[in-house]
Amino acid sequence: IRNATLLVTPDVTCGMEQVYWSIPDMYVEPVTFKASQNVSNYPVIGVELMPQRPRSFYNAQAVYSQMIQENTNQTMVFNRFPDNQIFLRPPESTITSISENVPTQTDHGTLPIRNSVSGVQRVTLTDARRRASPYVYKSIAVAQPKVLSSRTF
């Protein structure tokens, strides 16, 4: 299926979409996010650029392209983070890039963990429209515990 799938990424920066990391069962929500069990509203603990390399671009302003986007895109495109002003973005442009996936590894730093952690954890990657990202084939999050102060005992 990878040989026959064409990935297109409409974005105002011509392919520099972002990936939002959410691990709702393990980490405490950042101050500007509320706890949620809805994928489109998961609290975001890390942001990075989508691991893609744009190769070619085209203008998706044709009526057919607009009709497809109206019928398939979610309505929360323009305000995905109503409680976090940093993540507000303008509407998408008509420039679309055809991109290739590239492997990536990131470190999101030290994050506060919940007091009670269950055995199974969800790792969710969402794209700039807060959908579960179809562009990433495999993802894994590794947590390395660290005690920062005696207050945590």
From Swiss-Prot:
Major capsid protein that self-associates to form penton base pentamers, each in the shape of a pentagon, situated at the 12 vertices of the pseudo T=25 capsid. Involved in virus secondary attachment to host cell after initial attachment by the fiber protein, and in endocytosis of virions. As the virus enters the host cell, penton proteins are shed concomitant with virion acidification in the endosome. GO terms for biological process: endocytosis involved in viral entry into host cell; virion attachment to host cell. This is Penton protein. It is found in: Virion; Host nucleus. InterPro entries: Adeno_Penton_B. Gene3D superfamilies: Penton protein, domain 1 (2.60.120.550). It holds the Pfam family Adeno_Penton_B. Transmembrane segments: none annotated. It comes from Bovine adenovirus 2. All late proteins expressed from the major late promoter are produced by alternative splicing and alternative polyadenylation of the same gene giving rise to non-overlapping ORFs. A leader sequence is present in the N-terminus of all these mRNAs and is recognized by the viral shutoff protein to provide expression although conventional translation via ribosome scanning from the cap has been shut off in the host cell. One of its GO terms (cellular component) is host cell nucleus. The keyword Nucleotidyltransferase does not apply. Belongs to the adenoviridae penton family. It comes from the Viruses. The keyword Transmembrane does not apply. Interacts with the fiber protein (via N-terminal tail region). Interacts with the capsid vertex protein; this interaction binds the penton base to neighboring peripentonal hexons. Keywords: Capsid protein, Host nucleus, Host-virus interaction, Late protein, T=25 icosahedral capsid protein, Viral attachment to host cell, Viral penetration into host cytoplasm, Virion, Virus endocytosis by host, Virus entry into host cell. Induction: Expressed in the late phase of the viral replicative cycle.
